[in-house]
Amino acid sequence: MVESTDFYFQWHITNVCNNRCKHCYHEDYDKKNELSREQLLQIADHIEDALEKWDFYSSASITGGEPFTRKEDLFVLLRYLENHCERIAHYDILTNGILITDKDISTLQTYKKLRRIQVSMEGPTPASHDAVRGDGDFLKVTNAIKKLKANGFVVSVMTTLTKNNMELIPDLIQLLGELGVDYFALERFMPEGQGGSNADWTLSKEETRRIFEYMTEQALQVKVPHLLLYRTLYCLCSDDVTVGAMCSAGVSALTILPDATILPCRRLPIPIG
């Protein structure tokens, strides 16, 4: 298996989602212009052809919406990536986790290129998490994490950082360690889509810096979960612009939307294909 890759695709296979998270950057949650199963496989072929032309190997994140809302198509696509896309070296699934059944876990265990499953958590307690994702979601997500870990999957957790949960990050890291989560990352809240009505959740520059300085410090101490630092903020935390990496949008990464529109980045809505 190829260990390192030259390129990255974030592939949104659907806008449909079973949640309506209050910070979500999506606005539309319907199937309008969603690609068919056959078209998804054609896109996979186009990706493989492009990577071969560039002489690149790629990783991919398969997401939505919620990808498990079309799980039959998802599993067909993953099997196709396994058997027909040599240049896509490995992939992750980004999900809220709550639609994954025992049968799905058995299916997922057959995919050799599946590197990790990323689920979302917004806080270390039912109150802090469910306030964003809906009543009862915290219990469903923690149960999903436990089940995935018990079956040998590498699990990462992504948290959207807001004024509401920024002081809860230390407790969340502790909880994730107890759950055996392998990786943890923070994403800054951007008041777009559903989140546009909650613009007051946005952190100030000073608050952002303080949290990421804390994450940088903790990354040297906390082993479980491994803290994935937001690369473009290294310079923010160190005042050294030579540390870290520049944004990869359009350089070593692309986003594919459910209707096959190509963007440099999901947060940069400028169609380039």
What role is predicted for each listed range?
Residues 1-115:
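Conserved alpha-helical substructure of the radical SAM core
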